[in-house]
């Protein structure tokens, strides 16, 4: 793993901006809102609420050779009703085959009682493992709202429409926030569908799409299981704890790379990480008490596996306060920057455990070897319940 750099102790999430301490769950609810506001203002940029109008063109089901069904629903978001400008998004819904559904109902009693559990998969790839477990998969092609062009001053259809109709300075959102906003719009659609159980939604994505899944899931309690995979910098990885060769804030916000992903001005913290008012365990604490799983490769050096492990440890006290200590999870596998069958299997085990009470088939709470001891990372703890 090599040398681990600790720029500063990980900040205390239990201290309000005015210096007061969190003592109760009610205090945390207020502090949670404060943290969300700070993270958006400083790191990701502020984002608009739901559009004033959404038009939906429901696609026709296509029977697939393997017995599954697929359709494409076309959505048009109007930031301002009647303004004549909309933002298009296509969501691909895939339903499991009858054989897969029967097998899932046998394995998980209650499966499909109020509609099927569903996975919102950020990106265009098919999530085969979820379908085989009896989950509806909704593919969210986030690049329709905001392209992924390295080193460019990106402004995709979503941000451009809001700038034109609401005002150029109305929202400071970067690309990750724009993608998360689109994920929320996809969830708006999912919870309206009779095929889907709105109480059994999970979100996942890998790499930049893992950053999206984490931010979207942190801000939207309708995501009952949140799984960022290999999300690294601006995702589940710490800015303050870095393994040798891991992406840091300077690399992320370089004008030659992905500076457009974050809020304007966030690059000012590059090289001055010790002045950051937060670290990524604050973002992950917003998911609590809902189940949160990071899936990581031990050789995925650029994604900062040791920093992700450190941030996992620093998220735990919030889960402890909220009475859900086992819902904060992490899983490491051998290998590099990929979204593997092993990752998917652990994620779906957690979904089955959450939605159907199935036992976990593995221990997803293993801290990466070489992670600095907790007392080197932070000294604060959850208030006593």
Locations of regions flagged by a protein language model:
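Loop/turn elements at helix/coil->beta-strand transitions in domains of secreted/extracellular proteins
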Residues: 115-119, 133-136, 197-200, 221-225, ...
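Alpha/beta-hydrolase-fold serine-hydrolase catalytic core, especially in secreted/extracellular enzymes
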Residues: 1-90, 95-101, 108-114, 263, ...
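Aromatic-residue-lined binding/catalytic grooves and analogous aromatic/hydrophobic interfacial grooves
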Residues: 93-97, 183, 188, 267
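Mobile cap/lid helix-loop segments that gate and shape the active-site cleft of serine hydrolases
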Residues: 228-283, 304-312, 318-324
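Flexible loop/turn segments at secondary-structure boundaries
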Residues: 127-128, 145-148, 210-213, 233-238, ...
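Primarily recognizes the serine-hydrolase "nucleophile elbow" in alpha/beta-hydrolase
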Residues: 185-246, 272
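Cap/lid segment of the alpha/beta-hydrolase catalytic domain
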Residues: 111-195, 232-241
């Amino acid at each position: 793993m090599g040398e681990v750099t600790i720029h500063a102790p990980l900040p205390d999430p239990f201290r309000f901006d005015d210096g007061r301490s969190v003592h109760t769950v009610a205090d945390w609810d207020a502090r949670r809102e404060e943290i969300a506001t700070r993270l958006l203002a400083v790191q990701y940029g502020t984002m608009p609420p739901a559009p004033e109008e959404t038009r939906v063109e429901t696609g026709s089901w296509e029977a697939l050779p393997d017995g599954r069904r697929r359709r494409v629903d076309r959505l048009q978001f109007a930031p301002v009703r009647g303004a004549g400008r909309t933002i298009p998004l296509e969501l691909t819904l895939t339903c499991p085959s009858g054989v897969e559904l029967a097998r899932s109902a046998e394995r998980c009693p209650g499966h499909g009682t109020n509609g099927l559990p569903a996975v919102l998969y950020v990106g265009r790839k098919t999530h085969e493992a979820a379908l085989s477990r009896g989950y509806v998969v909704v593919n969210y092609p986030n690049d329709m709202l905001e392209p992924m062009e390295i080193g460019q001053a990106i402004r995709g259809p979503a941000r451009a429409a809001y700038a034109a109709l609401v005002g150029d300075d109305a929202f400071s959102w970067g690309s990750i926030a724009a993608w998360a906003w689109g994920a929320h719009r996809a969830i708006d659609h999912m919870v309206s569908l009779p095929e889907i159980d709105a109480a059994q939604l999970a979100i996942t994505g890998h790499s930049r799409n893992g950053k999206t899944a984490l931010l979207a899931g942190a801000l939207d309690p309708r995501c009952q299981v949140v799984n960022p995979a290999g999300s690294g910098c601006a995702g589940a990885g710490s800015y303050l704890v870095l393994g040798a060769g891991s992406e840091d804030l300077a690399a992320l916000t370089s004008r030659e790379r992905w500076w457009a992903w974050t809020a304007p001005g966030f690059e000012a913290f590059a090289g001055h990480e010790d002045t950051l008012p937060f670290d990524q365990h604050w973002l992950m604490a917003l998911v609590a008490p809902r189940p949160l799983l990071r899936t990581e490769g031990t050789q995925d050096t650029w994604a900062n596996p040791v920093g992700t492990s450190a941030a996992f440890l620093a998220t735990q006290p919030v889960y402890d306060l909220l009475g859900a200590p086992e819902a904060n999870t992490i899983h490491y596998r051998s290998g590099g920057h990929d979204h593997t069958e092993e990752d998917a299997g652990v994620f779906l085990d957690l979904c089955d455990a959450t939605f159907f009470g199935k036992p976990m088939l593995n221990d997803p709470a293993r801290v990466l070897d070489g992670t600095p001891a907790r007392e080197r990372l932070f000294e604060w703890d959850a208030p006593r319940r």
